[in-house]
Amino acid sequence: MAAQRATLEVVDELVHEVRPGMTERQLAARAEELAWAHGATGVWTPIAVGAGPGALVCHPAFPPTDRAVNDPDLVWFDVTPEFAGWPGDATRSVVVGDDAGRERLLADARRIQHAIVDACEPGMPGNELFAVARRLFDAYGYELLDLLGNIGHDLGRGGVVTGFIDPRNGTPMWGCWAIEPHIGLDGVAAKFEDLVWLGEDGAVVLA
């Protein structure tokens, strides 16, 4: 809980600091700097930043570049610090400048994220939650951009990932899961991510 709380503080600070002209690489370095200031001991997977066309791909194989934030733009930050073995994982998106289309995508992405999180139930199969997400994407008219075709993964101590939320995974979901649908349309993308604990007492968003 404390690790995720600190992670959310880091990503929220980034959302308020981003400006046109800053590069993905600069923003990733700033994310690490903020994470250390919040007590992080490392990162369990590389921090990712997406700006402009770079926001269409979120994967460790595509690290932050010298691509600069435009005006207008839609930028996301996927922040992944570790605190003495406990991982944090959060993504937030923000519109830079004034653009109604990007603002609409941002609002829809947030609504979709909230709806998927609200649908989480302890022990539900991963592919059932994916089906919920797929219906939302179709209803809102967006594409799923994740390169592996999933909307999230489990997350254990040390950043261990053993399963994904995709059409093929019928394993019951228990423990900590990252819910992170990466969606877009017409060359613009947005992403939100939260950690949800699925236990005997129900589903709890870690914050």
Give the ranges of each region predicted by the language model.
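Active-site neighborhoods and metal-handling regions in enzymes and metal-associated proteins
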Residues: 1-207
